[in-house]
Amino acid sequence: MNPFQYSKPADIHEAVHLSSAVSRFIAGGTNLLDLMKENISRPEHLIDITGLPLNEVEETAEGGLRIGALVSNADLAWHPLIEQRYPLLSQAILAGASPQLRNMASTGGNLLQRTRCYYFYDATVPCNKREPGSGCPARTGLNRIHAILGASEQCVATHPSDMCVALAALEARVHVQGRGGARVIEFADFHRLPGDAPQRDNQLADDELITAIELPADHLARHSHYLKIRDRASYAFALVSVAAALELEGDRIVDARLALGGVAHKPWRDRAVEASLIGRAVSRETFSNAADAVLQDAEPLEHNGFKIKLARRAIIRALSDAAVAGDRP
């Protein structure tokens, strides 16, 4: 770990004015400290934001929720309003990491965690995400955990977050503050596909700080389900995950949300497939057709072709489980 300057600002204005291209904000540090220990991230300045007033969950006038960026993953998962109104989010958070990590990890930090690609974490090998232009050995190497959707010649890494898959399905919005003022980013636009710049995971500028996540009022809570498929029962990242939510009138689908994790550089959502579900009857055939449509452009690598079949089955199961989910207030 390299030497660094440490600051603890008293307010958001001071925090964003301390930031620069060589600084990093730190809260729980559950990913950043690992990256620093492995010499993957080498910030010259750490800005401790744990003293900022960003740790509340508040109701909005529109019937949604505003979640402060410093609310811990554990507190968010068990918050009564989240359990009641957004059970999909609670399920996703509790499927990730371990109790100890969830106690420390912040909501804002969860959005910023970096890929768990083996090659990204090995500073002795090339990696376009770590060193742009150096190459992507995962394309021809050990690529069992890598992307089957939205990848590029430059990068086949996947996004590791469970929480973000649910936030994508819930159409969250990300509130950020920079020197130039505040702005709101639609969750669908927050994370990037790798393209020719895989070193950029998201749309944040160097001086911008996530201050809150906003959830719109949700009418799909009753019929929702988060399914995570992984190599072991706990403390493992998803090979494939699915956040599914339905609004039903009888056995007819009125609205649908479907997001996948473990398959792309960002949570993967196909709005055209969601739209195709509307008006359809709840059935295995309906869900099978949706799964096929989501995966029609999947491009497997040498070792991860199994993910296509796995994702197909996971989509069908998650939608089926969402359709029969028990009554929720």
Summary of predicted features, one role per range:
Residues 1-329:
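C-terminal structural segment of proteins
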